[in-house]
Amino acid sequence: MHYSRNTVTAIAVIIGSLLIPQHIIAQADAAQTAQTAEPRQKVTLTADDAVELALQTHIDIKRSQITLKQTQRESSHSWNSLLPSIKATASGSRQGALKSENKTAQNTQELSAGLSASLTIDSGLGAKIKKLKSAYQAQQASYEDTVRSTESAVRQSFYNLLYLKEKVAAAKSTLESYQSQYDQTKNKYDRGVVPELDLLTAQVNLETSKPDVDSALASYYNTLHEFLNTIGLELPFSTDVELSGSLDDAETVQRIGPEVIKGCEDKSPAVRQLQDALRTAEYAKQYAYNSAYLPSLTLGANIFPEFHSKNLETSDSSDKPYWNVSIGISLPLDSWIYGSSARDTVAAQDDTIQDYKLQIADKKKTVRTSIIEKLTNIETSQKTLKARHLNLELAEKSYKMTEEAYQRGTKDLLALQSSLDTLHSARLQLREEQYTLLKNVLELENELSLASGTYFTTTSN
């Protein structure tokens, strides 16, 4: 009797596992007992719960809030450019003569205290105020984009966890089926109905399916811990997290027609951010140009209610409080010189504007292509889902018939194993297609600046 290489290898693994020292097995059992003895808590988490937590704790949203407050403050205080610069001054001086004939007149001491104010009205002030208001409006839109993209990412991750959970369930179901097959085959072998090879094959299938369960569990829990960190949920180690939701939400996705392509570029957050940056750059250029080529007005005022002067030779003293006002107009001339820094600053702003225009044109093409691709993928997934359901129905009936035939002895173990593998594969293919559809729809909604769930007939959890 000859065995295949895979069968011999698997049998060797089984035999090796039986040779593990008993004290190691005892330690593992003790650790498992200690863990199970610890009281476990259970937390049920829905997609809406996860989104709500993420909106409160996500680092990107917090940073965007800080930037929003900053731009709001700068915009609401943009009028402060019209506030004068006010200073309080106090000074003392002493004057002496270099020649003796001027000694009496020039040997004096002066003390003064007063206030001075000055205000420069720049020709670019209006453009500066517009630039600050534009930056605030852009940040408002950016904050909304951050909130929306965070919600979309959290929901996608939630559905990914549901898919990984289905993989765990499939692996456990496979293990249970192989355990049942092994028990049945063992019973038949004891009665002399099947050969020893069938028993060894059933045992190999059972043992090799156990690591698959461990691998699926590890992938699920690692992803779950990353997800909990993302939404800012800290739980004790003894807490079990139960996800409340279903990949069947994919069945509620509406038909999305090609009409969404019309004007889709202007709805894109990426395009809008570039357009906001372009508008801000245009105001910055206007401010730089006005400051470089147009005159500015300067107003000044001084008042010295305390001004004391004393002649140190004659001891004569006098108090002479005074005030003065001034007005001036200045026109920068260096900006008219070729190669000056002022001209280069304006030219650099022009370059920035042209660069943003190129980026916007390119981004619109990219966004349009991306949305068309997603529409195609969504339509394909919806059609594929129908085929997946039919395939699963066929696999379930085929396995049931094969299992009944195996019980009667008209089908061998390999046929039953093949039928079971086909069934589990059909289930996973259905779940994978559902997750793919959900992911594409959520991404499309985000690219069109739509709230998550817009293209669902019911609110997905």
Question: What positions do the PLM features span?
Answer:
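Bacterial N-terminal signal peptides that target proteins for export
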Residues: M1-I11
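Sec/SRP-type N-terminal targeting helices
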Residues: K62-I66, W79-N80, T120-V147, L197, ...
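Short segments within alpha-helical structural elements
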Residues: T208-L233, E393-G453
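Bacterial Sec-pathway N-terminal export signals of envelope proteins
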Residues: A26-K87, K133, L235, D240-A284, ...
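Periplasmic alpha-helical coiled-coil/stalk elements that build and connect Gram-negative outer-membrane
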Residues: H2, S149-K267, K374-N377, S381, ...
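Bacterial N-terminal signal peptides
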Residues: A10-L19
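Acidic, low-complexity, intrinsically disordered peripheral segments
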Residues: Y3-S4, Q27-P39, V51, L235, ...
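A small-residue-enriched
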Residues: E52-I121, L233, I261-D344, T369
